[in-house]
Amino acid sequence: MEEIQRYFQLERSHQHDFLYPLIFQEYIYTFAHDRGCNRSILSENPCYENKSSLLIVKRLITRMCQQNHFLISSNDFNQNPFWGRNKNFDFQIISEGFALIVEIPFSLRLRASLEEKKIVTFQNLRSIQAIFPFLEDSFSHLNFVLDISIPHSIHLEILVQTLRYWVKDASSLHLLRFFLNEYCNSNSLITPKKVSSSFSKRNQRFFLFLYNSHVCEYESIFVFLRKQSSHLRSTSSGLLLERIYFYAKMERLVNLFVKVKDFQVNLWLVKEPCMHYVRYQRKSILASKGVSLLINKWKSYLVAFWQWHFSMWFHPRRISINQLSNHSLEFLGYLSSVRMNPSVVRSQILENSFLINNALKKFDTLVPINPLIASLAKAKFCNVLGHPISKPVWADFSDLNIIDRFGHISRNISHYYSGSSXKNSLYRIKYILRLSCARTLARKHKSTVRVFLKRLGSELLEEFLMSEEDVLSLTFPKASSTFWGVYRSRIWYLDIISINDLANHKSKF
């Protein structure tokens, strides 16, 4: 963002955010395209997209300057000369630039707010790297958890109205409304499932911007309740945009609840001295140490709030109440639960000895093996039963390239689940990838797996058998003698880039 600000300066006033002229600047689309290519660590190699031609951008800007497309109705969309022959590609270019432009006032306001009030950070707003240690330290002391599936169905006009509080440029909002109504059905709801694949894949930045603005609006309820009770700890993570939005929400009084009748009178129904809120992408959890009556009141309150504020139906089954001692919580790719760890302590006083049975709560994290195998089967590494198969599409690559692709996926999965309580299930994943790699190489050389391994030796695939302590010793060679004791405890080896794919098992490898 600092690089972009070298080219232009915007007024930092809340009333003068004139973003519309930036849409006609060529360098905006250059920056947007350079930052828009997302790569997946789970993929065999980075994602390389065809860069948009500068000539195409110039022609598109020329059409934008010549046509007053805001006066054209949606019925004339197909005859609109503003769009070129490939209107989807034109929409992709403009949406990338528009998503980058709208983020500018958020960044400027955050920086101005931090400079004026000398605020470095807010201690309860943490990054994705802090979620796992947070769960490990806090969940063993809690009883109930609300497993919330964030409502993502929202009318297009509500999205535009939400952005009005932040983007004061009416022309930019009209352009946003024009895009949404032309690309989607204006009478439908915008949901990740209903949006076409070209919209979700080619316009990820634009789509995430709209979704994050909606999510941060619903999170304002927790900001308000935190002002009422200083013990509400929140952990939220995602794109820079939602972090900026959350900081700004913390610094201004949320008067959203003034219209709710007798809200202050009924606030004590949901006040609780120890609440923990964690969110990642479309899923959030609200954990409490209180009784079941309190957590049920929280559920009823959240359902009523979303239905009233967003004018939409919110099914109560989107929020499930689970007791941590009896149910496993699926979050960030892990199956988490709190189990009792029994221990026997012998106490002796003079000639009398006693055996004291003591049970301690322990935060337990398991690897969801079945969803992982399903993802491997979808990526054609094995069948639905988990039996390894060859990867024919990789048979044309070199031997070292094939081994590197399989090893890359195996290392990422092993590193991500290094904090699991039991890693035995990971050996099955490594076995599938190892044998799939061997069968792919054997297919390439028109041989069998046994003959191929016998000829080249099993050392060819030794990286699949490398244990986690070996990886740590290679990463930190000077302290390798101390890793055996450390390895017995959890080691959260996280990658902020690949976590999006590993936290969602349905993603492609």
From Swiss-Prot:
The keyword Chloroplast belongs to this UniProt entry's keyword annotation: yes
GO MF annotation, one: RNA binding
One GO term (biological process): tRNA processing
Swiss-Prot/TrEMBL keywords: Chloroplast, mRNA processing, Plastid, RNA-binding, tRNA processing
GO CC, alphabetical: chloroplast
Compartments, as annotated in UniProt: Plastid, Chloroplast
Record has tRNA processing as a keyword: yes
Pfam families in the cross-refs: Intron_maturas2, MatK_N
Function: Usually encoded in the trnK tRNA gene intron. Probably assists in splicing its own and other chloroplast group II introns.
Family: Belongs to the intron maturase 2 family. MatK subfamily.
PANTHER family to which the protein is assigned, alphabetical: MATURASE K
UniProt protein name: Maturase K
Gene: matK
